[in-house]
């Protein structure tokens, strides 16, 4: 039996495995009946020592296991650069020649041009040419950074923002330190579309509304693909403020971070969408198979291209006409019109709970609701709950 010492907080349930674990412990966890993973034992008697040579196959499998458990191993991250036209490809050559791109914590990277890559595609690798051929934007998504495995697409974009063209996108097949709300870190397995891209905005008042435009663009992109391919409509919905749901199960999320420099907000927008991995909940292709016997499957490359094609148009409306011009379309897609929620309101030294009905969004991007007393109010999260609809705080609107 081969063994591996796992780190704390190893709570990931391995597919097709019977897993026994102890949260917040330093023990090794036992994994049995798994076709994909080695068995792990509480004894380390047979574990290879630093002096014990292991072959390449063993090394890769050990690395796969240790990465899944969150161990601190920093391999070289490969970044493949490409562009829609010669102009973007010249930018790619310049970035490579000047060794411009960096990652946090001095993570070692290897930069390669897509035109230099002679390795055949493997498995579910992102197909760059398929994506670029489907892209029809003027700005967004035309410069691409792809990696088979990387800590975080958000880090690639935010750490190199000033050196990248506007609308540049980084997409990864696997990321093992994906960013979430409240600085949560996520491991994103194969089958997910994970990408981040650059946006610059001047009006800070509308930056919080950008995530709504992004989520709307993704739902509309899935509709466009379905219409083009003659597929049944998948009811992809928006859960405020930044999640995507199918059949009451989460399949995606949006994260926007920004910095202010030279009178502009540099926004890094990150999106994760479960396209073809039905664990731990569901994915787009599973939802499609439940609706139709079609052999068609959603492809990450099409979704990314259709997303940018739609986002660029919606973003133009957003900047020039405001979010009000998109509200009707947004409300058709979100989950909350008419939803009744319990909110908290401070009265003197007590916290009183009231039931209100959601009406829409306020100009600042929070929830607009009405109480049983017909008093309009703004709802915002308390920042302590993973569920935005637990612990909502009520503020009266005059």
Regions found by a protein language model. Give the residues of each.
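Structured surface patches comprising rigid loops and adjacent beta-strands/short helices at the edges
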Residues: 372-398
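N-terminal lobe of the biotin/lipoate ligase/transferase fold
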Residues: 2-227, 231, 392-398
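Conserved, helical-rich catalytic subdomain that frames metal- and/or nucleotide-binding sites
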Residues: 291-354, 359, 388-398
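Nucleotide and nucleotide-moiety/phosphate-recognizing core
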Residues: 163, 185-302
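Short, mixed charged/polar active-site loops
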Residues: 250-253, 351-353, 376
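SH3/SH3-like beta-barrel fold
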Residues: 366-371
């Amino acid at each position: 039996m081969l063994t591996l010492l796992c780190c704390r907080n190893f709570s990931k349930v391995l597919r097709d495995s019977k897993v026994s674990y102890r949260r917040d412990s330093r023990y090794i966890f036992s994994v049995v009946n798994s076709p994909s993973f080695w068995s792990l034992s509480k004894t380390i008697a047979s574990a290879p020592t630093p002096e014990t040579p292991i072959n390449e196959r063993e090394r890769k499998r050990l690395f796969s296991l240790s990465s899944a458990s969150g161990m601190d191993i920093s391999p070289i991250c490969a970044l493949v650069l490409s562009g829609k036209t010669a102009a973007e490809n010249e930018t790619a050559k310049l970035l490579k020649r000047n060794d411009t791109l960096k990652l946090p914590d001095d993570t070692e990277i290897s930069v390669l041009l897509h035109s230099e890559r002679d390795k055949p595609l493997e498995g579910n690798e992102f197909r760059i040419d398929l994506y670029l051929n489907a892209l029809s934007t003027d700005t967004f998504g035309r410069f691409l950074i792809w990696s088979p495995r990387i800590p975080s697409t958000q880090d690639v974009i935010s750490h190199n923002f000033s050196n990248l063209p506007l609308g540049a996108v980084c997409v990864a097949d696997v990321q093992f330190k994906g960013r979430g709300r409240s600085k949560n870190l996520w491991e994103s397995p194969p089958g997910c579309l994970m990408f981040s891209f650059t946006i610059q905005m001047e009006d800070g008042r509308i930056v919080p509304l950008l995530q709504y435009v992004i989520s709307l663009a993704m739902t509309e992109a899935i509709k466009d693909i379905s219409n083009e391919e003659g597929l049944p409509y998948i009811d992809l919905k928006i859960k405020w403020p930044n999640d995507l749901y199918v059949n009451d199960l989460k399949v995606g999320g949006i994260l926007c971070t920004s910095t202010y420099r030279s009178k502009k907000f540099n926004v890094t927008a990150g999106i994760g969408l479960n396209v073809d991995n039905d664990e731990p909940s569901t994915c787009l292709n599973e939802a499609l198979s439940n609706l139709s016997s079609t052999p068609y499957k959603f492809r990450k490359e099409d979704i990314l291209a259709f997303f940018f094609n739609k986002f660029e148009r919606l973003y133009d409306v957003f900047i020039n006409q405001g979010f009000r011009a998109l509200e009707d379309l947004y409300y058709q897609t979100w989950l909350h019109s008419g939803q009744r929620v319990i909110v908290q309101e401070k009265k003197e030294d007590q916290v009183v709970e009231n039931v209100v009905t959601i009406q829409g969004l306020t100009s600042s991007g929070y929830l607009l609701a009405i109480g049983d007393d017909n008093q309009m109010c703004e709802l915002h999260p308390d920042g302590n709950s993973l569920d935005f609809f637990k612990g909502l705080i009520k503020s009266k609107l005059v």
